[in-house]
Amino acid sequence: MGVPEPLVEAADALEDLPARVGERDWGRMLPAARKDWYVDCNWKVYVDNYLEGYHIPFVHPSLHRELDYARYRTETRRLYSIQHAPLRAEASRLPAPAAASDDGAQFYWLFPNLMLNVYADNYSTNLIVPLGPERTLTVFEWYFADPEDEGVRRRVAETVEFSDEIQIEDIHVCEAVQRGLRSRAYGRGRYSVKRENGVHHFHGLLHGYMNEQ
C-alpha cells in the first residue's frame, strides 16, 4: 500500500496553492480558539461530507442563507481542492469580503486529511484524525488578528458558535451515513457532476495511493 507524500515533499504537486493563500496577511493571525470533536464514523465519510456541497441547502439552513449557492463551485487540483463560496448581499453571520468580486469563503482540502477554511477576517484549520474504522477525531483551530482585543474576542465567540451549529449538523449526517454503510440495502450511486466533483477527486487520489505498488 502506498504512503501519501509528506507535505513538504509534495510542494510541487501543490502548484499554486502557496501563492493563493499567500495573498493573505497571515503574519498577523494568532491562535484564538480550539475545539475537538469525536465522530462515530470513518474518517473518509467525514472528508466526503466536507467536500460535497450538495447537502448544504438541506442540512445547513443557516449556512445556506449566508451563501450565494448558485455560484458555489469546487475547483480540483492535483493534491488539493477549493470550494469557492460567494456570499449573499444580505449575509449577516459571515464577514463580507474586501471586494464584491471576492469569495466570501474558500474551503481548501489538502489530501488526505487537512482542511483550511479562509474567511475575510479569520481562518481555521480542521485536522481529521482516524481513531478506528468507525471513529474519527476532528481538531478545529481558529486564527484571528489581535485575538485579545475585546471586539475580536466577541467575533471569535460568534465564529465558533456558528461553526458549532454546522458541525453538529454534519455529525448527525456523517453518523447516519456510517450506519447506512453497514446496511445490506446499501448500494453505490452516481456522482453529481456539479456538486460532488471534489468527492470524486478525493476517491481517485485515495484509490491511486491504496493501489500503488
Description of each model-found segment:
Residues 1-213:
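C-terminal catalytic domain of Rieske-type non-heme iron oxygenases
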